[in-house]
Amino acid sequence: MLRIIDTETCGLQGGIVEIASVDVVDGKIVNPMSHLVRPDRPISPQAMAIHRITEAMVADKPWIEDVIPQYYGSEWYVAHNASFDRRVLPDMPGEWICTMKLSRRLWPGIKYSNMALYKSRKLSVQTPAGLHHHRALYDCYITAALLIDIMQTSGWTADQMVDITGRPALLTTFTFGKYRGKPVSEVAERDPGYLRWLFNNLD
């Protein structure tokens, strides 16, 4: 069983306002769970515009420390951009898998947000009624569908996905400089001197 976790926050620095999870068991999405959470700071207007969770909606909700034990119980936790969720959550007893890192390994060059990958891979999943993208439970279903696709495409085991998640991300496409948007492999063939220059000028 792999447990997909998603959080919505007060902003990029954290402050959880919502947590949710679903489990993937034998390729099926089961056991949905979600909680609104009272944050430890004000919700930024930018974050509120994205997830539409207001101060009034969370004012009387429990703290994250009070609800997080309900999300324990898996050997593996999965998130899209797992480093963010790991940073804002209390410690979770298990290994972490990042679908963003796995997707970059499998499909370099595709936009890496979970919704962009979901659409480009032409995936389909029944999401909860009344929710929308950037609500935690909705996004858990999107990430779960992506995880199932990754596992079916790659054949990777959970432990292999943990290993890949722990490795430094490989640059497959230049995001800077005169070759911005070009695959590294193409530049290596056409202009190997540029790669040598880059390596020699790394700080």
Spans of model-derived segments:
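Generic detection of long, well-ordered alpha-helical segments
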Residues: 64, 137-140, 188, 192
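Metal-dependent phosphoesterase core characteristic of DEDDh/y 3'-5' exonuclease domains
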Residues: 2, 12-19, 23-53, 72-182
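Short, surface-exposed, low-complexity cationic segments
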Residues: 186-203
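Short, solvent-exposed cationic patches
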Residues: 54-56, 202-203
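CheY-like receiver
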Residues: 67-71
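Glycine-rich, highly charged phosphate/nucleotide-binding loops
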Residues: 57-66
